[in-house]
Structure formats: structure tokens, C-alpha cells
Amino acid sequence: MPNRGAHFSISRRKDFLMDFSERVFCGHLTPDHTGRRVLLAGWVDAFRDHGGLLFIHLRDRNGIIQIVFSPEAASADVYRQAASLRAEYCVAVQGEVRKRLPGTENPHIETGDIEVFVSELTVLSESEALPFAISDKAMVAGASSAGADHVNEDLRMQYRYLDIRRPAMQKNLILRHRISQCVREFLDSRGFVEVETPVLTMSTPEGARDYLVPSRIHPRSFYALPQSPQLFKQLLMIGGMERYFQLARCFRDEDLRPNRQPEFTQLDIEASFIDEEFLYELIEELTVRMFAIGGIALSRPFPRMTYAEAMDTTGSDRPDLRFGLRMADVTGVFSRTSYSIFKQILQRGGSIKGINIKGQSEKLSKNVLQNEYAKEIAPSFGAKGMTWMRAEEGKLESNIVQFFSADELEALKRVFQVEDGDVLIMVADPSCAIVNSALGQLRLHLGNRLGLIPEGVFYPVWITEFPLFEPTDEGGVTSSHHPFTAPDRTDFDPGNIEELLSLRSRAYDLVVNGEELGGGSIRINDREVQRRIFAALGLTEEDVKNKFGFFLRAFDFAAPPHGGLALGMDRVVSMILQTPSIREVIAFPKNRSAACPLTGAPSEVKREQLAELGLLNLGDKDVLPGDAEKEDRIDHLSWVSRIGIAEGERPVMESILAQAEELAAQVGDLAGNEEPVRSVAPVANRVREGLEAVRLSFSGTGRLLKNAPAVKGDYFKVAGILD
């Protein structure tokens, strides 16, 4: 077996003594270096043998340079060793920088006008065959290149250290570093002090589940990893720090989505003796500077929109304002309608809203509107139906236009400013929330389908005046943001639900292109107001004392007026780099299942560790964590794939799994330095040959929902993690 460690004898030249202090970065070479001898070190990115000349792309963090091995510059020994190099070998070379011959320049790399003719070579470390391609640069103009863009993401994360070698990933991490430096420098210039807050803290209700850490010293007691530094940053204001910030690590045990991770970084900011305008100005200036690092120019001031306006016109409190398709309320148009569906909805206190899709009648045919949108797409967004009309020759036409009066049709044309070629869609429902939600999702769906959302455009907006409380199913209220947000007025009755739901908060969210980048609020600094907020939430004095006693005690010592905001840095960087997921801007992220394919976390622990932490016999269950019997693998396969496997199919599935294990073992034995071979197997059903897929009726959902991870009513409930 070849030695995989670093070795230096392969150069067979005693005069090549490496002094890495003299090293030049590959990407820093320019035509000004022509004629100079340089020492380079990095990884073999790509290899090309031209029979007598060997061309290699050498890559380090700063870029790629082409190095050349020729009989004229290199000895026979060096040339022979160079011929044995493979992808991702780590090497050091010394040679002369030369300009490339006319016509051989490579526009794919920044150093494409020059190359280095190598005279000395040392292999620092060898690499096994790669699980996926790392190189993403073509060696010659016009050639294609293969990267890791289409590699299974879990495979990339299993070998994340290799994935990080890719220039695209390194660029992401370097730009993230520069954005973090920008944050620190800017906030320091504005008098903010960076302070670290505890990671092991107390569990407090903040909207998501806590990650709990057992204490060995205090058996059966637990720390909680912070969902945010909310209470500590307010305590810093009471402590007189006045202006605080932190790039804080936060942890939330919640369902994953493309822009969520169980652990994430947020820019946490808090300041005393300020108001909303101070924070608007501060965050706008910082946001402009951060986006400028990615070459994106934002104009100031950012527009502002109340929560009510955002919901009324876009159906979302995270509005994407890069395109039109604003919603309009036409409830009044149909106040005396004879159309029975609308009439019944209005009699139940409902509402009717619509959107004018300007000039899109050719793309939205009657068939598309009726059979796709009215029957399938709108119901999938929660609407019970959708009404549509097309404007042609000065008239509105649809399959139900005959049910509306001439006055109603004329009123619609006025409200929506209808012109020929326009398409109207309307949603009606007894619930205004359903109307807003369904029509808002239709707005986004149509914007994407019709290509109305411009690329490379960034539209920031402040959303303000959120409701302070939201109703609960039990008839009470819960905080829209968190219970420390200041209300717009303090003379409220904590027992009057109707009054509580009318309160507005002094909260604000920063939204860009339909995505919330952060949010905050002016905080409560009066102990009595804070107590009444807790009372409105149904917390007893005992609850408050147990959960927030230490916090409220601080209010007895003169808390200053204060407020703050937190920005999700993973989201900010992802948006600036325009990546499909925040996982692309995190060095070692968790996957869609909140697991780490690289380390295998989370993992079981030994019974002895559980005993040391006092976690044995906490409940009455016989099976303990880390002590469970192995789960039947067919049942497990059935559950994770959401495919029902009949008892008669189990032997076939066992055979397939056994064959897969045997093949994996054979492949493992063959692993070596060979280049990987890829092939795509044809789609085939080995277990249920000859069976055709059939559409099941929803009248009986037992079979349909057999393997659902969770069921609510007749619905298959899954985590919102699909990209």
C-alpha cells in the first residue's frame, strides 16, 4: 500500500529546501511576475498530458495557476514523478513564471495569461479516489467543467472537508468573513460593544423547543441552549452598557426549512435611550454596507409598510415587492350580488379579494385558469375555489360571468383598471385570513410562472405595527413576537381579549424579496406593564416567578428605555450570494433531517454516560436512550420512504437489502486511486412489476396515511423542509 502521509524524498533533489515563508499564492500571480522563480503549494485541480508536456492546474485558496512540466525545465526524475500525480494530491513546486503563447490563454481563470514552468516538485500528501469532482474550472477555453453542483447534498456534507476545497464554497466562506468584519467595524464606529452572553442558560418560553443539556453536578436538572440572547441583552441595558452587539450562536429545535438550521448565527443588537428611527437608520446603513460587499447596491431610505397594508395587498407579512400583482378588496362590489356562492360568503361576514394580472391572457387560457388554478392550485393553497375572468374586446368573460350584473362587472373593471388582455382572479371565503393567505400564495405562484419577478433586484422594506397578540384556539392570546415587546399603548385591560387583539406592537421586521432577514422591537422597561403582559398571556404569578423572576427583579433597579433587533446572518449572506440554501454559506451545516453526515451527530451514548448524568430511570419506560433493541429494518425502510410494504413483500425487500449490502462491501474493497465511474441505472420496479399507479379516493384515508409521520384529520402532515 502506498504511504498516505507526507513525504519529501519523492523530489529526489536535495537542493529543493522548502521555506513556506517565501511561498506565493497561486491566485496572486500576475504578468508582472514574468521571469521570476516562485514557490507554490496547493492541490492538483486538473491534469492534461500532451505527450511530452504535462499541464496541471494547481489550486490554493486564492486561485488557480497552470503549471507546466517540460523536459526543458524539469529533470527526467521530476517529469516522471509529475506524471504520477492525481487529482487532489497536495504538492509544492518551484519554477519560472512565463507568459502564455498567443492563442493559449485561458479566460476561465484569473491567471489565464501566464503559467509556471516547474523545475522542482515535492508531493506533500497523496489523495485517494474522490467521492465527487472538486474541480470547477475548464483547462482550456471552450471546454466544459464538472463541479459538485449536482452531487447529492448528503454526500457533499459527508465529505464536507472536500466540498470546502471547491472555490465556490471557499468564496462563500470568505465573503461571509468579510461581512462579519464589516459588521464589527461599523458597529464599533457607532459606539457598540461586543459582549458574549451565556450558551448554557435557563429554559424560557420563546416559541420553539429548547435543546436541553443535562447537568452532571445538578442531577435531573438541565441547561437550555439559547434560542436567542433576548433576556441577557436586555439585562446588559439595565446594566448600563447602552450599546451592545454580538454575533450570537442560537439553537432552536424546530422543523427544518431551506433557510433554517437547528444552530444558526444572528447579529444581535440592543441599545438604550433610542427609538425606532435610530434603529431604522442604523440597520439600513449596515445593510447597505453588507450588500455592497457582494456587489449589490441598495438605495435608502428603505420603504415602510404596516402589517395591515402588507396583508391586505400581498397576503403576507413578508411581502415580495419586486413585482406588482397587488390584491384589491372587492367585497363592496358584491354587497348586493345575486351570485349565490358570493352571497352566502358575505352573509357569514366573509370577504372577496382579487388580482389583475395585466396583459397575460395569452399565457393564462381558459383551460389553465379553470382546470389548473381553480380546480387544483387554488385549493392547494387553502381556498375553497377561485373565480376568474378574462378581458376581451372591452368585456369580461368567464364560465360564470352570466351570474353577475352589468353594474358589478363595470365596478370590477373600474377597481382593477381592466384593459383587454388582462386576467382577473378572485378568492372569496368567510375567513379573511384564508382569502389573504390563498390569494397571496397565488400571487407568488403567478409571479414565478409568468416570469414577473426580476432577477438580480433587491427590494428591502420595513414591516411595522404588528398586532401585539394573536388569538389562540383556546380563546386566549399569545405574543405575536415575544412577551417583552412594547405595546403602542399601556392603558389596556389584560383580561379583555377583544382589547388585547386591538393592540399594536412597537415591533418591526426587515424583509427583502419576500424573506425576513431580521426583526426587533422597542422593549418594555416598566415592571408593571411587563406584569400585565404576562397576565394577558395567562401566566400565573408562580409561572412568572419560576420562568422570569430573575429578569423582573432587574426591573426593580431602574431599567432604561431600550430596543433592539436581530438579523439572521446565515440568511443575509445567503441572499447576498444568491445561494439556494443557507447550507451553502455554513461551513459544517446540518442536513434536512437536522443530522450531520460528516460526524454522525446526533448519536446514541453509552448507558454509563446516562447514569453519570442521572438520566436513568427518569420515567417508567423500560427502553432507555442508547439501550433500545435494533429496529426492524423493513419497518424502518417503510416508514422513512412513506411506502407501505406488505407482509408478502418482506422477503423480496430483505433480499434486495442483502444484495445492496454485499455490493457495498465489494465496492469498499475495491476503493483505491482509480477515477470514479458513473452510470445512471434505468428506472424499474423490481418488487411490483406490472402494477399501474392508481388515484385513490380521499373517502378512505386509512391506507393513504398509513406511513405518514404525523396525521392531522385527513391530512398527511410533514415537516416544511422541501427546497
UniProtKB/Swiss-Prot annotation:
Database matches in Gene3D superfamilies: Bira Bifunctional Protein, Domain 2 (3.30.930.10), GAD-like domain (3.30.1360.30), Nucleic acid-binding proteins (2.40.50.140)
GO process terms (BP): aspartyl-tRNA aminoacylation
Keywords, in A-Z order: Aminoacyl-tRNA synthetase, ATP-binding, Cytoplasm, Ligase, Nucleotide-binding, Protein biosynthesis
Principal location: cytoplasm
CDD domains noted in UniProt: AspRS_core, EcAspRS_like_N
Subcellular location(s) of the protein: Cytoplasm
A GO cellular component annotation in the UniProt record: cytoplasm
Identification of the protein by name: Aspartate--tRNA(Asp/Asn) ligase 1
